[in-house]
Design a protein with these regions (language model features):
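One-carbon transfer enzymes
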Residues: 1-149
Length: 149
């Protein structure tokens, strides 16, 4: 069976941890997109010689970078940019990993909202990416205490 390839869209420490895990697990990562403040991702990507784009993926340069990689899977975690349809639509499996039990706390910093609202637990959701913000069909959810993040 032919292993599907992945382009990772990630930011911050959580994104760096996911990238390390995916690479260490032997998945075929073709490229990484991140932002300029995600130095752990930038350093790791350069160390293992993966192509990297730093900046807005919706820019002409970002779109051109993505087109260089014919990957089936888009994997997004803690990514600071909302990716437009012309980008995520070019992947067979555009997947996001989100730090709440969707549909609760869509968008950025969901764990902060869980704390503000005195939630006893939260969780993580993987879902397909669509035009809405964290509104795609849910693939998997896992509950955990709010402090697990």
């Amino acid at each position: 069976m032919n292993q599907k390839s992945i382009v990772v869209f990630a930011s911050g420490d959580l994104g760096a941890k996911l990238l390390h895990y995916v690479v260490k697990s032997g998945y075929k990562v073709k490229a990484v997109l991140t932002n300029k403040h995600s130095t752990a991702i930038i350093d790791f990507t350069k160390k293992i010689k993966l192509p990297i784009f730093i900046g807005n993926p919706n820019s002409d340069t970002g779109i051109g970078f993505i087109k260089n990689f014919n990957s089936e899977i888009m994997l997004s975690v803690n990514y600071i940019f909302l990716v437009k349809t012309n980008i995520f639509g070019s992947f067979d499996f555009p997947i996001n990993i989100h730090g709440s039990l969707l549909p609760k706390y869509r968008g950025r910093t969901p764990h902060i909202w869980a704390i503000i609202n005195n939630e006893k637990e939260t969780g993580i959701t993987s879902h397909f990416i669509n035009e809405g913000c964290d509104e795609g069909d849910i693939i998997f959810q896992k509950n955990c205490p709010y402090w697990c993040f």
